[in-house]
Amino acid sequence: MTNNNMIFIANWKMNGEKSHISGINKTIKFLKQSKNKKNQIIYCPPFTLISSVKNKVKNTKIKVGAQNLSQLNDYGAFTGSVNSKLIKSAGGDYVIVGHSEIRNQENDIIINKKIHSALKEKLKVILCIGETYKEKKNNKTFSVLKRQITIGLKNIKKINNIIFAY
């Protein structure tokens, strides 16, 4: 049995302004005309645009996510940090965790804390896994992925709210 449902995740990175949100109209039109009603689209704009994008896609199947989050779930004096509560209150449905551009500054234990924080607030997680070029060249792919998944999912009881992105 094959699963023909696809999930398209648009990570805007550090791009986009409020004026760019109107471009989502093309996606909404495409979804309405699409024969496969099970495909899913998730937009992950910069934090500053999450609520605006969420407002734009209300009454559609399109979901909205954040590009990262703090491992800390509490409020406090953490300049520049965004926790899962703030993402949820802005309208986020998903959060990207462990993206390669950030993973090199974090370890698997921090990734695990972020996953726990996101799931606690009922956010779905897009867990990015993958090896570096050097690890691939040294035939370490399997061991790296195994480590990232094993430590990243430590004490996670259910993985049905986690999407793995490689």
Describe the role of every protein-language-model region.
Residues 1-166:
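Active-site loop-to-helix "anion-binding N-cap" substructures in soluble metabolic enzymes
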